[in-house]
Amino acid sequence: MKRQSIAAALLALSAVAGTASAQSVQVIEAGLARSTGDKPVAIRGLLDPAPQPNGKLLMVFPGWPGIPRIELKDGRPSWLYLQQHVQELKPLLHQAGISVMTVDCPTDQWGARGTNPTACDDSYRSSPLHAQDVRALIERARQAAPMKEIYLMGHSYGAVSSHWLALHLGAELAGSVHSATQSVPGGGAYSGYASSTAQIKPEQLPKNSIYLHHRDDLCRFTPYEFARKQALNGLMTVVGGNRWSDVCGKASYHSYSERSAQVGAALVRWMNEGVITPLIKGEGD
């Protein structure tokens, strides 16, 4: 993405940056069998369990820059950013018994801290190693809480992960949803970001792999047409909402602004009932 788009997106997400005050939110960490110098590598997730969990976990891979830098600081969960609209729809998921975990890149893929990534690009996200790392995190999450069914949701650049993990993890997953998929590479220094998405053919994806996208998404890196063509197994199309921010930012069609409640309800129906909502809209749409 362009630098101005990235900066706007991070400003939009600043409301959920920082440290956790809720006692239920916890950092889940899985040690990995490799190191960077003398530092052991780990992959972490920020787990927010439902008050009355039904055994289903939605693992979220956030959009640009895609590296939330989840860690413990002074014994408290800390992060660079979280996906704003996921935070907005999370109460609906929790009410339905669904727990949520934001997934980070492993620490050897953090790169430089900031608004533009220098690591965790498609060469890692498309690799079997990524699947191996996420599998280790799933195992640790299951030790922390009873999780029977694992679902993935990748948003924007995070959908690169959800695509490849759907292929590599297969039957280990109950389902995957690719939200506002970035299918156009960033270009320039970011040519390695979203360069692999178009390599995946629709027929390669499992039957439980579906798409979620706003029909009028104006972010040039995430065209709706890609989702429409790829979605052999199901497409949930969002209409209406707000587009006052940067087109790739918080208050935009790209982030389902003013449609997060409807998107949350559709996700609950899909995860708990297996029902795909073809058109997600608000009153008056």
Report residues per predicted region.
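N-terminal cap/lid segment of alpha/beta-hydrolase-fold proteins
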Residues: 22-53
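Short, surface-exposed "cap/lid" segments of acyl-processing enzymes
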Residues: 51-92
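Structural cue for short, hydrophobic secondary-structure segments
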Residues: 60-63, 102, 153
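Conserved alpha/beta-hydrolase
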Residues: 85, 90-111
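Alpha/beta-hydrolase active-site loop
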Residues: 85, 113-144
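Primarily recognizes the serine-hydrolase "nucleophile elbow" in alpha/beta-hydrolase
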Residues: 139-204
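The feature captures the conserved acid-bearing segment of alpha/beta-hydrolase catalytic domains
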Residues: 175-240
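C-terminal catalytic histidine-bearing segment of alpha/beta-hydrolase fold enzymes
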Residues: 233-285
